[in-house]
Each structure stands twice: as C-alpha cells, then as structure tokens.
Amino acid sequence: MAAKIISAHELECLSAEGSVKIFDCRFALNDPDAGRAAYEGSHIPGAVYVDLEKDLSGPVTSGTGRHPLPDFAVWRETLLSLQINANSTVVLYDGGPGVFAARFWWMLGWAGIPDVMLLDGGFEEWRRQGLPLGTEEHSMDRGAVSGDTVSQVESAGYVNVDYLVTRLSASDPLVVDAREPERFSGRKEPLDKKAGCIPGAVNRHFALNLSKGKFKAPESLREEFMRLLDARSPETVVHSCGSGVTACHNLFAMELAGLSGSRLYPGSWSEWITDPERPIEVHEG
C-alpha cells in the first residue's frame, strides 16, 4: 500500500490541470459537526467533504468500536458516489496532522485505489502558504464512472479481534498503539469506557511522525520505527488506537519509511473493551 505525500504548491499545480479529485476530511472526535462547519467556512477550491462517521465508518453496535469499517459493498457504493475508481488521482487533507486523511487513505487502499496522496501539513499548511480558498460546496453527482473498477483487495492488511485474542500469548503480532501516552497507560481516558491498553502493546503516539506539522523525512521515520520494532519484521506489526483512525497515521508513516506490510486493527481499543473477558493492561506511574 503506497504512501505518498504532496506539498501545497504541488497540489495547486496539479489542481490547475483538472485531473485530481480532492477530499476534505476534517473532523473532531469531540465535536462531530465541526469538520463540516470548517469546510463550509473555507476549503481548498474544488474539494468535496467526506465525513468520518457518515462516510468512512459503518454502523456502531454493542460489539464494535466507535468507528468500525463499513461493509465493503457499502463502501464500494460510497466510492462510486464520489466518482472514485482505480484510475483516479486522489488527494486527501484534514486540519493538519493527517489522521482523518490517513483513515481515508487506508480505506482507498482496501478498495484497490493506488494513486492517493496526503497533503503534507493539511489545510493549515495550504492556508499558511496563502493559497486560494473556496467557500462553494462541491459534491460528486452519482453516475456512470469511466473505468469503474473498485474491488476489495484481499491482501489489504487488517486483522480482527479474534485474531489478536488467539495471538496474544505468543506476543505475535506486535501491537503498536497510536494514542497519546496518557491514554495508552490508562492514566486518563476521555473517550472510551475503560482505560488502559491491549496487553503487550507498545506505544507510539502518531504525533511523533510529524515535525512542525509535516511528516518527518522517510529516513528519520525509518530509524525511529526500526528502534520500536527491535529487529521484528514490519509484517508482524498491527496498528491500533482508540477506534481505528490515528492507527492509520502510524501505518502510513511506516509505509512512507519503506517499512511495508504492517496491518490495521480497525476496531482498536474501543472494540477490545466491549467484551469484559478480554484482558487489559494498565501502566502505573
């Protein structure tokens, strides 16, 4: 799953050619309407708004996490309604860090869409550069899409909760948790009903992938992740977080660093804790 970034000025040039589809993924976990409101206030010209909970998640039930993957047939219909297919060139952005854009990136890879880029620095970088802003709302009208090829990629790496439960005792795979250290350790939990982490998990807050709001150089990311993996293969890594969103940022960063093959646990912590029989770990101090 290729990870590619694009600068604000590169996107401005590409957009002028008219051959790119741009999507605004801004969202706030503590205020689900904030992303659309921000989009309506101003956005990159031509961008279409995509909502984490309405477009990039399936129904929440008692046994799922907060942002479960949709059924693939539903996801395919969403992509067709957005006029995205395997021939599309797609650029994604959010407010800056890239966590919501990374979730969309992973889901596009799940559907076999290869040419997808994240705007480095997101909307904040675009605005900081003084580039044009738009206020007109854009949407894709449902219709026939040239080269309509959207299909589930069986090799798109993700695991379910049963896989993790059966592998925990062997410490295989290595679960990398993208939440901030206070949530990972169990010292605080503002979003979920229980605090702590999956036993044996290690912590890498997604913000460590960034420097001054942009992705670190691939060689720096590679060095940092190699230390975290401690001689393990990238294929042994499963990414988790609170609900399968910021985990995608770590997965993207590993791919950007040339460490390919890690997988996503979409349900993450918020799914893990739905069953009281599943063990949890709390780190004191």
List each model region and its residues.
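Cytosolic catalytic domains that perform sulfur/thiol-centered chemistry
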Residues: 1-285
